[in-house]
Amino acid sequence: MATCTYTVPDKDASGDNFYGQFICSQAYIDYFWSTYGFSGNKDYWDDGFGWEDPCNVDKPLARTFNSLYMLTYSANDYLNDSYSSPILNWARRYVRENIDDLRSLCGDGTAVASSFSGIFVDDRVELYLGMWYGQAVPERASTFVHEARHMGDKDHNAQFPPGSVFGAGNDGADSDWNYQGAWMYETLYLWWFYAAGDRTTSAMRQRARQMGNLYLDNAFATRPPYSI
């Protein structure tokens, strides 16, 4: 972490102060650690990333736990994670079934997270500074859904559209909503969180709506015919 530099943004605006009041329980810490791919990766989460200080929401680990709390407990009936339910219910299950190796790194500023899988590849998801300090809690939770979709063998298949904030013409978009790619999963999660998220605040739900609409406008080669 000594080679990483970052500035902690407003923790009320990001939702970290709100969610941080819940995660500082050994039961939650143990559950997140054993469920979402941290096990065996202490070396990636110590040395300033927060392993020694898991309740400090200035640090990456606690900020990750905040997003996992949202991912896990935002459905009113969160114990029901059946795939026949809305994505707000089953996103937690989808993430834990597809991500079993979660690592923290500084990154080079070009991505908030990356997934790696395939033959002769150490299957893993890496999280970078941009996720913890450039995203609010709802985007972080949805980033897990996005990367889990990649780990479920669904790559991006198109270029970003004209005017996209992600760089018009660059690779990394989904062709359309029906492709059911990572952007569709991420946007759908944010949509449901906005519509029915529980154990949260109205500000966090509005943030999810804002980001979901941003992805609809910018992350699909053919814009989906929806607005949140």
PLM regions and their residue ranges:
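Predominantly extracellular/secreted Zn2+-dependent metalloproteases
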Residues: M1-A141, M151-I228
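Substrate/cofactor-recognition hotspot
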Residues: F144
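Walker B catalytic acidic pair
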Residues: E147
